[in-house]
């Protein structure tokens, strides 16, 4: 007997029967609902059940199951959950488990809400005693791993393996968990999980698991452990495939081990494995990220040649590398190639290009790319808009970025980018507005946003709000990181709130965060507050924790201690550090030596050096330290430091360092020490160069050892060194000073014959030497024959010739030389003019002297020199103006006296260009004073006068005269 026809109209007639009060049997209802289920009339099932429920007709567990499945098949998971929770006890074990599997799967997969699936799973285990299948547990784990929610993934895994459920998990689950930890940047947890799984005996790893394990080890930088693992697996008979090698190579790239990655790729190819599109893409991506885009492009060509078709990931990797290097046009060429071969582009590729465009500052082109995206049917997501917003902010167009953000539904990155940009320009009003919008959007705060908000509060001086936000971080499931503590400490230190900064620093010390930047910042702040003892304690703690001391912080502390306690303060610090591991404070101790040397505290510097030697530390002598000692006429101390230093110290010294000391020793007259240091350097394997020997030759000449200097010069070629222009210049100059002009000219000719080009200084040495002795004909011969065609005479050459003729009293020739070279645009210098003016004045030819004086005062080089003296004196009246006035008044002798004063001011010792003394002549020129000062720079006149007085028995007058002259010498 049939209770219902097999037509849709029959269905409605049965429903009509129910409405009329007819009560079918449970068996009939069951058969009817199963019939509807086979027809997938799920809505009809639910409508029919609603009528049954309204009639309060009792139904059995099979009917409850059919209704539950109807809800599930209609994806009405919330209704299904509610229905199942009410009636689950009426279902048999198998259908109940199957329904829960489907319900959890529906939320986790279809709705992409694995967290809801986890809630149902917890409820199942806690309240219903129902265990979903192992497949459900595994699918939940996979979903959480994909989302990076590893805490939830591990919770599901623990439920799966507890004693009540006791489902085994396989290598695919294990590899998924390991991969998940690596993706979130916690490879150490991946390694720990693997070791626990193996140690517990629940897992026998296969190649799949080992493949993901290699990634974790590479990320941790444990390259040697990877090699050991591979060797062990080879011994156990594992055969590696392309996937294993690709993962291994990818791990090396992520760990920054480029060379190791390329070596493994070569090994893979040598073992006969052909690269596929994945392995090629990994190589290309790794090379592009390292900046080797040209090599990546070469690989792209190779893979195409081998018949391996690049995919979108391959092309995107290269385009990202090109954009990173600023090669936008090349990136767009590749982009157009992608389009031409018919590969469908995605949003990420556009984001990559837009980011590259923004970095170049071409924002108009970036907006054009947005339009191009939409034309291709790619709807820009917040990822794209965040890229544009970031580009606008980088270009300083923060207001425009703000406007763009108002047209999209922003995320935490949107608001953190805007907030950080407004903080940088210190726009407080905009900061407050962005914060308001962020709070209104009710977006969960991440750690980056929290740190930016802290920075904003501190910028505004809202220290209470900053502290409140910091205290609220645990409630938001946020853990302070290095940036958090650094931001808070910096904010407090900036306004001098050292107590609050120290309190925050103590919070850092209690945490697991180990931030060198915070230690450095607090040390710097303590130094500024003068709390040097506390700063030293923090320094010691920093080193004990193995943290890095910033060089700026180190030097700030040293300078502060020296400013407060002088040399004793530095020595106190150094002795206080003796308890520490020697190597950690090496840099600071070397800096202490440098500081003490710069301050002229050489004894203290040597004491620090001796402490370092006792501790077996490597003392570095950078050129700055050695040069400081030499510049302070402490070459002998530098010499002693070097010869008494250990092997490790000397290994850092090169020929430049030795030459600096040798040059200083020669200048200070320690020739024997200089020669000893040469031998010492050679014994340490340092090859001395021509510059070193130039210092020695010059030192010998200065000590009157010209013969020895020439012998050393002759020996240079024997030791494989070629004398330079400087070498010849030193010897020629000193030969001329000794009056050995023929030897000087022979050396000059020898120099030219060897292909060296004498400079003007060398020629001037010979010319000036001849002129000093009045041998003007020889001087002119050198100028006309030897110089011409090789080098152009300069102002010094002209002035030397003028001086020579003036000494002979031949003013006509002196004037002729002046005029001849003037016509060639070579003017005399200050002294050339002075010699001429004095010469004509002595001859009584005052008008000619006056004309030359007038010409002198418009000479560019002379005016510059006089102005330099003016600047040094800072007098209200211009010296040049005063001289012009004297010239116009015809007072040439008085002008000469002032010019002599200028000469003695510029060259007070006759040769030192760097010392100056104050002029006292602008008003009443004291004739007697000038006369006495003339003696200062004329030793022969001084000696002659003193000798004459002594010979005639006028010792008292001689003594008074000497004291008078000494009083005029520069102090």
UniProtKB/Swiss-Prot annotation:
Signal peptide: none
Database matches in Gene3D superfamilies: Tetratricopeptide repeat domain
Pfam families recorded: PPR, PPR_1, PPR_2, PPR_3
Keywords for this protein: Mitochondrion, Repeat, Transit peptide
SUPFAM superfamilies to which the protein is assigned, alphabetical: HCP-like (SSF81901), TPR-like (SSF48452)
Transit peptide, from-to: 1-64
Broad class of the protein's primary localization: mitochondrion
GO CC annotation: mitochondrion
Compartments it resides in: Mitochondrion
Stretches forming PPR repeats: 101-136, 137-173, 174-208, 211-245, 247-281, 282-316, 317-351, 352-386, 387-421, 422-445, 452-486, 487-521, 522-556, 557-590, 591-625, 626-660, 695-729, 730-764, 765-799, 800-834, 835-869, 870-904
Highest taxon, organism lineage: Eukaryota
Family: Belongs to the PPR family. P subfamily.
Protein name: Pentatricopeptide repeat-containing protein At5g57250, mitochondrial
